[in-house]
C-alpha cells in the first residue's frame, strides 16, 4: 500500500521509515509503513482504510521495546504527542452508558483524569501535581506513555498503573472505540491480559485530593531518588527484566558479576545492573545477545530464570 491508497488523512504517512530514533535505545530497522495520526479521529479514519489482516504495531515513547535490525512488517502507529488529550472529567459521566447507573463512578472526594495513550507518564505526573493529587506522583518514574503503562501495568516507586485505573478506552483494528472496565482484564505484575487484538487509546485514573505543595514535594523526592540510582541520560529501555518474587533482578545480575559486561556496543550498566546501555552505535542484535547472556548467566549462578520486561519485536 502506498500513500495514494488513502484518503481524508490529516496525519503523516511514511513508507520504509527508519525506527531507531523513536526508541530510547536508538536501535532498530525500518517500518514498512509508519503513521503519525493527527488525533484520535484521524487514527480512526486511517484504520478503516487498512486491510483487515494488516499487521499493526503501536509505539509510544519506545522505552520498553527492542526493535530488531530487520525492522517491522506492516504498519507502525506512533501515539506519542498525537493522542495527547489530558483532562479532569466529570466522574458521574464516566461509563454511565455502560453501567446504567449515574453513580457507577461517583466522585466521593476523588478526582478522575482521562489521559490518551500518547501522553507521557511524566506529563501525567505533572498534571496530577498541578491538581494536588499526590498519589499520582509515581508516574514520574515511568519512562513511557500512558498507552504503554496500561499495556504492561508499568510501575515505579511502589506504585502501579492499574491500581489507579477505573476504566479504559480501547480501539480495534476497524477503528471502533470500546469502553471497558478493569474487571474485564487480568492484571498481573508487569503484564495485562484481555486486550484480544485491541489497543489502549485512553485511561481513566482516579486519585485522592491533596495539597499541591505536598504533591510537588513528593514528585521531586521521587525523581531525586531515581536520578541517584539509574543511568539517566543514557540510551536504555529502563528495566530489562522483571523482579522475581521476593528479590530484585538488579541484585541478581550484580551478584553474578555482570556489571560492565559488554557484547558489541551494548553494556550492562555499572550504575544499575538491570539497565543495558547502547554505548553509541550498538545494534539491536548486540543488545538482544546481551539480554540472553545475562539471563543464562543468572540462571547458572542463582538458579533463577529472569523474565524479560522489555518487549522484543521485529525481524532479525
Swiss-Prot record:
Positions of the FAD-binding PCMH-type domain: 27-225
Single GO MF annotation: flavin adenine dinucleotide binding
Location (main, coarse): cytoplasm
One of the record's GO cellular component terms: cytosol
Reaction catalysis annotation: UDP-N-acetyl-alpha-D-muramate + NADP(+) = UDP-N-acetyl-3-O-(1-carboxyvinyl)-alpha-D-glucosamine + NADPH + H(+)
Compartment list: Cytoplasm
Superkingdom of source: Bacteria
The protein's role, per its UniProt record: Cell wall formation.
Residues annotated as the enzyme's active site: 190, 239, 309
Name the UniProt record assigns to this protein: UDP-N-acetylenolpyruvoylglucosamine reductase
Signal peptide: none
HAMAP family xrefs: MurB
EC number assigned by the record: 1.3.1.98
Swiss-Prot/TrEMBL cofactor(s): FAD
Amino acid at each position: 500500500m502506498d500513500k495514494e491508497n488513502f484518503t481524508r488523512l490529516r496525519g503523516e504517512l511514511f513508507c520504509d521509515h527508519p525506527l531507531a530514533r523513536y526508541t530510547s535505545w536508538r536501535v532498530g530497522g525500518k517500518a514498512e509503513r509508519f503513521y503519525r495520526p493527527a488525533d484520535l479521529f484521524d487514527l480512526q479514519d486511517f484504520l478503516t482504510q487498512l486491510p483487515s489482516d494488516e499487521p499493526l504495531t503501536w509505539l509510544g515513547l519506545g522505552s520498553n521495546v527492542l526493535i530488531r535490525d530487520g525492522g517491522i512488517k506492516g504498519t507502525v502507529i506512533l501515539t506519542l504527542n498525537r493522542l495527547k488529550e489530558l483532562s479532569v472529567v466529570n466522574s458521574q459521566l464516566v461509563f454511565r452508558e455502560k453501567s446504567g447507573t449515574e453513580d457507577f463512578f461517583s466522585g466521593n472526594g476523588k478526582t478522575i483524569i482521562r489521559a490518551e495513550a500518547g501522553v507521557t507518564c511524566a506529563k501525567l505526573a505533572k498534571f496530577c501535581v498541578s491538581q494536588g493529587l499526590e498519589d499520582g506522583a509515581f508516574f514520574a518514574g515511568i519512562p513511557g506513555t500512558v498507552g504503554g503503562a496500561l499495556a504492561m501495568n508499568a510501575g515505579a516507586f511502589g506504585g502501579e498503573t492499574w491500581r489507579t485505573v477505573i476504566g479504559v478506552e480501547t480501539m480495534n483494528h476497524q477503528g471502533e472505540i470500546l469502553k471497558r472496565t478493569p474487571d474485564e482484564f487480568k492484571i498481573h505484575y508487569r503484564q495485562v491480559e484481555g486486550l484480544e487484538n485491541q489497543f489502549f487509546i485512553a485511561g481513566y485514573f482516579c486519585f485522592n485530593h491533596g495539597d499541591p505543595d505536598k504533591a510537588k514535594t513528593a514528585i521531586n523526592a521521587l525523581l531525586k531518588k531515581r536520578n541517584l540510582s539509574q543511568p539517566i541520560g543514557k540510551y536504555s529501555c529502563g528495566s530489562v527484566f522483571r523482579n522475581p518474587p521476593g528479590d530484585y533482578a538488579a541484585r541478581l545480575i550484580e551478584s553474578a558479576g555482570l556489571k560492565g559486561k559488554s557484547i558489541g556496543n551494548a553494556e550492562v550498566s555499572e550504575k544499575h545492573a538491570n539497565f543495558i546501555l547502547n554505548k553509541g552505535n550498538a545494534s539491536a542484535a548486540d543488545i538482544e545477545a546481551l539480554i540472553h547472556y545475562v539471563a543464562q548467566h543468572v540462571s547458572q549462578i542463582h538458579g533463577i530464570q529472569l523474565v524479560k520486561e522489555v518487549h522484543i519485536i521485529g525481524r532479525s
